[in-house]
Amino acid sequence: MSNIDNKGTYNAITVSSVTSVSLDPPSLLVCINKTAGIHDSIEEGSSFCINLLNKNQEDISNLCSSFQEEGNRFEGDQWDLNRIPFLRDAQANIFCIVDKLISYHTHTIVIGHVTDSKSKDEINTLTYVDGKYE
């Protein structure tokens, strides 16, 4: 998941699950820990992108899941930073506007209204199962 906050700071995080909520309107949800660096940049009406990674992007998944590497996530040229930051070579990019935020104990449930998407023709999606990438 990636976004840009109202101060112009780029944020990205690896999420373990993205869930479809509705087809009409098209929407999905992710759950973000309240201690995550990206958490406070997520507001109703703000935009974000879900980047579904391909199998050769294991390194970016690890980078975006490491607190110690938070400042290094946007180095290099793999990101398109023109508007909402997204990974150029991802399997798919799903662009959303935050529709609703639900606080639940340690996490915030983020419901996003899908506004646009793009995907690669060849399916080569990175998955994480039983503690390892596949």
Name every feature range the model reports, one short phrase each.
Residues M1-E134:
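Basic, polyanion-binding surface patches
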